[in-house]
């Protein structure tokens, strides 16, 4: 079972305790933050602060120590100052996300933000801030993947690699993409894989054995 996404306010200790207790629930949580600045979060009407969000991250680490965490981040929301942008970067350093979905703010007519606030951040500033967020996330993703080298992971093989029909691609229970040599393995197999190499987006490994689940 793979958890999809949750508003941080719904990520209670009770939910995390249950997720950590059952082996058939994946070690992966998508917990959107949007911004690392409490003042920006207030303007977004997100109903939580930076501190409250980080408390939920700490709870995830407590109940699910090996859990991979992803998020959504928006650069250049209405009125965002450079200091508020730096708060987002510092939150990223504190959490060290495995994956992030990153965008710059684009006004949508009819939304609360469009009604209440002016889209006043110049596009070149939005793009520069987004580039800084992406660069930091790329560093963190590579860091998280390097931590996996030498470990053994259970991988569900999902499809043939685009670059070679002699490779298969699967995912760990932490939602990390793993590439293996096809050999006698088939799509749909669960296999134990020793991770040997990585990029910031992909793990590579050798199959040790097939797993029957």
Name these PLM-found stretches:
Residues 85-95:
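A glycine- and small/hydrophobic-rich beta-loop-beta segment
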Residues 15-16, 88, 180-181:
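Short beta-alpha junctions and helix-cap segments that line functional grooves
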Residues 1-82, 93:
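Conserved SAM/AdoMet-binding glycine-rich loop
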Residues 19-20, 88, 118-121:
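Short, hinge-like loop/turn segments at secondary-structure boundaries
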Residues 3, 31, 72, 92, ...:
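Conserved, mostly hydrophobic/aromatic
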Residues 10-14, 33-44, 75-82, 98-124, ...:
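Flexible glycine/acidic-rich beta-alpha junction loops that bind and position SAM and/or redox cofactors
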């Amino acid at each position: 079972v793979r958890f999809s996404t949750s508003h941080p306010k719904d990520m209670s200790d009770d939910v995390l305790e249950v997720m950590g207790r059952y082996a058939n629930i994946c070690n992966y949580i998508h917990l959107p933050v949007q911004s690392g600045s409490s003042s920006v979060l207030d303007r977004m009407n997100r109903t939580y602060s930076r501190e409250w969000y980080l408390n939920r991250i700490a709870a995830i680490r407590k109940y699910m120590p090996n859990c991979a965490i992803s998020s959504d981040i928006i650069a250049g929301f209405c009125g965002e100052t450079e200091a508020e942008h730096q708060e987002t970067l510092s939150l990223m350093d504190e959490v060290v996300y495995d994956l992030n979905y990153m965008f710059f703010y684009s006004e949508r007519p009819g939304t609360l933000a469009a009604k209440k606030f002016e889209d006043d951040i110049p596009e070149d500033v939005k793009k520069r801030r987004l580039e800084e967020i992406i660069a930091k996330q790329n560093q963190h993703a590579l860091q998280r993947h390097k931590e996996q080298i030498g470990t053994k992971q259970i991988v569900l093989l999902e499809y043939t690699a685009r670059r070679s029909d002699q490779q298969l691609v699967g995912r760990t229970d932490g939602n990390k993409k793993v590439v293996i040599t096809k050999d006698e393995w088939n799509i749909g197999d669960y296999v134990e894989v020793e991770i040997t190499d990585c990029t910031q987006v992909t793990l590579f490994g050798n199959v040790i054995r097939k797993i029957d689940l």
